[in-house]
Amino acid sequence: MCVNVQNNKKQTDYKDIEDIIGFLKVLTDKCHHVKEEDFLFPALEKAGIKNENGPIGVMLSQHKQGRELIKQMQESVVNKMINRNTFVDAASSYVNLLRNHIEKEDTLLFPLSDTKLSASKQKELLKNFENLEKNVIGEGKYEELYILLVKFKGKYLK
């Protein structure tokens, strides 16, 4: 999609951009970040992991950066018009941030969680995550988001 916007292709629809921004807000911010910020990070802090100047602080900083980039993407769509440069810059930065963030989660945060949190605490966190998905995100939302991704894959990744 980003390449289509950058190359000024007509098939990039402002509605698609709004949909992908909505996807990012729900899946990334309302679900994934909330799981970490409301449940995982406090549990890690109680287990002795530093927030400030530590791995939690780094992750929180990246969450903040991601929210700002999503905001910039959203602001690039005004009155059904796309400010292509703003969108492409913000989306490209977001992709790079996300890759870096996921690598930190996979190589540092999640292994650290496995070593610092007891099995019972991890079970409790999983239950909290499931409740969040059901009660905040809503039943069927993941399926809806998956269908949206399949649509975009067919449209933009040919």
What kind of feature is each model-predicted range?
Residues 1-158:
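Small-residue-biased structural context
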